[in-house]
Amino acid sequence: MSVSFMSYKIRLYPTKEQENAMFNHIRAARFIWNLMIEKQRNKYLEDGSYISKFDMIRLLTSIKSENLWLYDVSNYTLQGACSDVDTSYQRFFKKITKIPNFKSRKRSKNSFCVIPNETYIKKKSGLLHLQKIGDIKFKTDFSFPIGRGKMKLANSRIIFEKSGKWFIYFAMERENQASVLTNKPMGIDLGIKETMVVAYGNESITFHNINKSRKVRELKKRIRNLQRVISRKYEANRVGKKYIKTNNIIKLENKLIKLHARLNGIRHNYIHQCTHKLISLLPCRVVMEDLNVMGMMKNKHLSKAIQEQCFYEIIRQMKYKCEWNGIPFIQVDRFYPSSKTCSCCGAINKRLTLSDRIFICPECGFTIDRDYQAALNLMRYEV
């Protein structure tokens, strides 16, 4: 039985004292990052070489002796910052990303690593223990093993989001289930009018566009109105070419961040519900298109709607959930004419445009909804 890692995101509720300690860890991680970036650049200018991860960790002893406040921070957090610098440079050497830069207090992501072995749920109190921080209240719907050394974590990290909430992210091993699959294949067509149109055997399943729901429309309206208020306040506080950010503007921007986070949460939760429902049907295989989302985004009339649909997230969730349940996942080439091919006779209607919602076969006269037609062709696709 294969093994994979499952990622978790858990909300934390620290006290004021614990929150100050966590902010101190964030400052320390950023301080070490910037210091190591500076040392890497100086080393390169000297002899064109690179400081390895282990050499950076060895430097921590002398750095801590010069900065005594770092003794209040977990040593694993400091080592994690060195590891992050090394990872960033390795990705730069492979030409995956740009060269690592200094982190700003205002613009950088507020996060730090925590030691996996010392992160566990206490038996008596049921609180989450974090080294150098203490026992923290948390909220989750998942059940975890209780006791020291029971939670075998990987890549554990604390993050303070812009919405003002604390979370811990980590991964745990899980055994992929060898589920008993049905003999029905599944074809999934993604779209803007409907989020997903699914062909499953002789069944048709449609997941409506969550962005057209009343809840999302009202939330987007609140965001638009708040953006107008903030824009007018900036104009009212303009001095020459400079804009003065007042306390009221900061409060409104924090409120706007929380609304965006809520909207994003609604969309992602809906995708999780849809993908879970499809995977629970246990099809013998799942077939989807390999969409060119970047190319589709170039259409100025559809780019916003495509962005709101989160196509990449839908495909990503279907991939890993299929892997967990032992379901073969197939992605068809993006140039496969799933919408233009007649599901009855196989003829291709090359004149079909985006505005045509009904497919009419030029050969046999077969009429069908174009999205369901695409889902049927994907379901019947053979590698």
Predicted regions and their residues:
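Gly/serine-rich nucleotide phosphate-binding loop at the start of the catalytic core
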Residues: 1-80
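Positively charged, helix-rich recognition surfaces that bind polyanionic ligands
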Residues: 6, 149, 162-383
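Short, surface-exposed charged micro-motifs
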Residues: 11, 118-120, 157-158, 187, ...
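Non-catalytic, well-ordered alpha-helical scaffold segments
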Residues: 20-23, 27-30, 76-83, 272, ...
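Alpha-helical coiled-coil heptad-repeat segments used for dimerization/assembly
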Residues: 24, 31, 42, 80-83, ...
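A generic secondary-structure signal for well-formed alpha-helical elements
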Residues: 33-40, 44, 89-96, 194, ...
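Stable alpha-helical structural segments in soluble proteins, enriched in small hydrophobic residues
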Residues: 36, 77, 81-92, 372-383
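Acidic carboxylate diad motif detector
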Residues: 54-161, 308
